[in-house]
């Protein structure tokens, strides 16, 4: 069927719809599906959370229908590899189809305005051009599988502080130059099927009601022809949202549409044209997805593909950033080592993802300890000490820690855990989050559940257990109440702000003895979804740091695995500090003092301060790398993969140095983007503030030389593109990859402009001694700024400098040209 024939079918169906049916298409039927209209053969479409895995409708924790867990957004973007990102997108499209979904709720392209943002891990960068390029690759990959991407969150959802109500206050120039480009590219270059509006307001108007942004810019100016959906419960009105361009309210059943919207049309408060346009867009997406021919009817599947495992491992290692490598301590060589000390809270924990809606129940995970044990075999002695913890709430009790490697979960159709069991299943985790979908036969309006397992502790002493829940919960050991979150719950940050604070209880247990664990739960007073989480912490020695230092002192090399996790970095709340949690900094200092051959493997989604940096020999930023966590880290440590990742965000020396510091998080319902266009490295360069690590920085086990920079012309006419070429040589004996970065500086600007703006990059592979000629291109828009008076892009006549290098501060070659004439661009 041709595009014209498909549009004809859309129009033919639209003409047959009643007003009530059109309106029904404008809201979800349930948490994940739109409304079907059987009389006309119009199926529902199903959406699934991304962006680092297609979860489906099940719980992101321990669900039997697992999913491939890919690296988080910042890790993918740190590869600076468009082709790789597109491959990841295609794999996620394949994963979405295993869950019966026609649309993936991804990618997340909000800008890293502040290093404290709880969702920075999920987004790509502080730079709009890099974010746009990564988004385009991701979307093209997803949609190559006939699954629609949904770029989010439109717009300026750049922190989690009061995200449902706060107003982001900014100028048009700031909006155009920094925050809109990823969405513009997603629409114009990648033809995204979907856009999701944000919760916040922009200059006083909620995103879902903002006619200037939704209609004026997104649909009319950019030409977006897909569906614009709300974030979940992010619709704020009946009339304004419908009139101003919000096509789909999610989730269902509707709160704002239905009969209320029909009445608003009948009373002329909402234009019929707006209803027709929204329904048309919904039908168009159903058509594009092929759902008319193949509606989703199959149950969700977990298909663990070997090629996806390999891709996840490559994407993870290619995105890791080598920050320090004194005396080439890395890569490690097995035949030169007798012992390695593995120290830190992340050695035996796979920190694969951040928190919030991006979470998935992974097919499998591998920890650094498990992977390194396989890599070194019997040749190298591995010692382990935890040293300290890094949790915000007690670590989740996983099924592999209990007898039989599984939890039993039983459901009851009442709040008292009485009468017959309605449904039972096994879980891989002590956590359950029910986003709309629930087990067969269970009444979602009123149910209770019991999670049980037998447990044999490895050590004697005081063991801690904890509960966090949306609803009532209590935890018992051999029938004894240990943690009571049933009698009273206090609201906390967990589960997007709907969950309770953590309730912790302790009990003395004996090593080797079998205990019966039971978590009881009911969903009374639950607003949107049900959830519980069982945390556990075994006894930790009071001298744990000293024990770690002793182990380090008697080892050839020490690897310290530290960072944050999905409790610290999550949707729903921001961080409050750039410090590593708990005593991790003290642990690194003490271990490095005991053994100077110390390498820190850092796992965070955002910058942290590093007061210990000068005392360690090496640092790797491994991020949250997905299910191949341990393997991808091992690949970097032992040189199976030559590190080629580059930072996508500036790491400040201290929190106070970041440009958003003065205006973060906002007050009186507003946050002023006072730094304007000077976000990230633009600010550090302009104000000459020295960062800990600059944007675009990343070391390699190889070395590269830049030479012969040439411009296509020294006098550029208006409307012309500029060709930029140079030679890059691998001057080392090891094959490697280099990211060549091109920045532009408008030397003679009449307005304040950054000293450097990233406008082009490419990633190349070079064999030892090999030279490649790199060709990059600057288009007229790359030279322009947004003029608030003309409401247009303006490229001013005068001298421009082209700067090419390995990072924003490691500039290897420079050249200049003159733009002959000032012009306003369309």
Placement of each model-derived feature along the sequence:
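Glycoside hydrolase catalytic-domain context in secreted enzymes
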Residues: 1-785, 792-809, 825
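Short beta-strand elements
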Residues: 810-825
